[in-house]
Amino acid sequence: MAIDVKAIEEHIRGILIALGDNPEREGLKNTPKRVAKMYEEVFKGMCYSNDEIAEMFNVTFEDDLCINDNENDMVFMKEIEIFSHCEHHLALMYNMKVAIAYIPKKKIIGLSKIARIADMVGRRLQLQERIGSDIAEILQKVTDSEDVAVIIEGEHGCMTTRGIKKPGTKTITTTLRGKFNTDPIVSNKLMMLYTK
């Protein structure tokens, strides 16, 4: 699905009029075009399904990997910074830090691909909970591992700049699949690494 930049421009112009401003005045003349271009960039992830993102980043390494299926060795990355926009208010979700872990089976994925998956999933109208489950689903598809964990901490503009107006409020969500959800030793190891 392609983003309709022209339609966004027209609607932003309409919003400016509805707000009581003049879209032809100097400071706003190019605003609809700039906003449409920005939306095309920040919502790029909406152009792709989880399957398409998995295919896009499906570069794995298998030849040099010696894995014992009984092991609980994990790959763990944290402090992956992303942003997103909440689907309820279109408000920015910011200061988002993502931690991702998986237990390799037969394939490992390049570290930069993990960060790129998180970034692409964030570039949608989202819920923080869904960002975690989307990342987990994609990583499961790419690595063929059921054992995936995603922890996200972030701030939400809909909490900090409107309504209750509580700046600094952080939301933490967890998505735990496979052993991360069923094996206390694995989940404890995850939390130890996360809080380190």
Curated annotation (Swiss-Prot):
Hydrolase among keywords: yes
Superkingdom assignment: Bacteria
A GO biological process held by the record: one-carbon metabolic process
Reaction catalyzed: GTP + H2O = 7,8-dihydroneopterin 3'-triphosphate + formate + H(+)
Membrane spanning residue stretches: none
Pfam families according to UniProt: GTP_cyclohydroI
Family the UniProt entry places it in: Belongs to the GTP cyclohydrolase I family.
Name of the molecule in the record: GTP cyclohydrolase 1
